[in-house]
Amino acid sequence: SKGNMAVLNMLNTKYFITPKGQAQQNPGAMGNAWFVDTINIVPNADAEIAGLNEFNPATTAIVDARFSKQIIDSLDNTAANIVLIVYKPNYLQYNSSSTNDGIAIFSEIYYSKGWNAYVDNKLTPHFRANYVLRGMQVPAGNHTIEFKFEPPSYFTSEIVAYVSSIILLLLLGFVSYTEFR
C-alpha cells in the first residue's frame, strides 16, 4: 500500500479494497481504543501532522502543545485494556482497566464542540491526539468512560420546541372551545 499504514491503523481501518475489487483484512487495525506509553508534544498542528509520518500509534501519541495541560507523564500500561461497550451516533461507552494512570487514545474523530467526556459519570477533559483522534487521561483502576454529544444549541432548541408545542396545543384548545361555544 502506498498510504501511511500507521495512520490507517490508528483510524481502525479494518479492510482494504484491492485493485481487483477484493476485500483484504488489515491485521494492523488498532481497534476502538488503546493506551499509549509515550506522548510526543509538538508545537503546533503542522508538526502534529508531520509527526504522523514516522510514529507507532500503538505506543505513541502526538499531541499539539495547546493540549499539553491535560497530559500526564504516561506510564507503562502494557497490561491495561479498554473496550468499547456501546456505540451510538451521539453516545460512546468504554470500560477500562489499568494498574497505572495513563493516556487512552480513542479511534474517534476529535470534535470539541458539543462532545463531553466522562469517567465514572464525572466530567473529564479530553484532547486531540494524532491530529484527528481523541485522547484522555484515564486514572488507574476499573472505569466506565463515556463520550456524550451534548451541544447547548440542541438543548435550547429542544426547550423552544416543547414550549412551542404547548403554546400550539393551548391555542388549538382555545380555538376549539370558542368555536363550539
Where are these regions (language model features)?
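Extracytoplasmic
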Residues: 1-77, 99, 122
